[in-house]
Amino acid sequence: MKEDLEIENDDLWERWRCEVDKGQGKERIDKYLAEHMTNTSRSRIQTAADAGNVWVNGAAVASNYRVKPGDVIQVLLDHEPHDYTITPENIPLDIVYEDDDLLVVNKPAGLVVHPGHGNYEHTLLHALAWHFEHQSSIVNRPIVNINDPSIGLVHRIDKDTSGLLLIAKTPEAKAHLAKQFFDHTTERTYNALVWGTFKELSGTIEGALARDNRDRTIYRVWDLEECPQAKEAVTHWRVLEQFPYVTLVECRLETGRTHQIRVHMKHIGHPLFCDEKYGGCEILKGLRTQKYRQFIENCFALCPRQVLHARTLGFTHPRTGERMFFDSEWPADMTALIRKWRAYEPNTLL
């Protein structure tokens, strides 16, 4: 069996792919996968198949499908259900679009997406629980239970990143949308302010990512020979606007690894402005004057987080087949910061 185990996002999904060997006899796919996938039960695979998350040669199959040589199998597994209950919290939401199948929300910086790692309250999912509970009594829409693992988040963004997020409201929508993320047929662009200026106007960063062995809370680019479990990642970037010592860039994700843009931009020498985890909270470029230092400190105070915004999101609607595209304007803190840099004159800070 030729296999490629890939974890696109260790908070939400385990994504697995293999090609069945030539000598393989016909066998139920749930049994075949349980024998070849580590720490995965047959019942878990059956659950994935029931949700439409097991595909052979691009088509969803049932758990009783019999594999044959040459079959290309893809599996998308939810992580095991969490042992806590998400209770409704009245947290304001900026809902960009909603129908019976899905919801697109514009997440503010500072809001954790889902519980975990010490954050078990005041998350986006708690806000969604409130929204769905109260919406059902006002609008003629079915009740959505955010604790149902077959619905919910399709992807995520970091706590201090703002911008667009997609939520599935039915199991069918989640399976369809998850497959689009798995196949990289979604469109996602981010706007980021980074340290330094560029000689080129665009480029591509390719570098496999895994946790840093010296600090498990951050990621780094690895050589695959040195760290075989690192996950390949590709980021395309282009310059939107250059300032004297920082640059506004657009990043387009080909893959969706944790901290991908933040790690990749640091890797090429351009950490995100005010990104504490990846070295962007230091004065990396510019003048050695007290006035300039004060200017940067004022900038940090104006937007005290990594300057990263999930600007656009494109995908195919899981029920209608319509191609949908959403654009989110910068939040107030990022807008104010960019305006400050546009007004900056180096000779006034000598």
Language model segments and positions:
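RNA pseudouridine synthases
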Residues: M1-L350
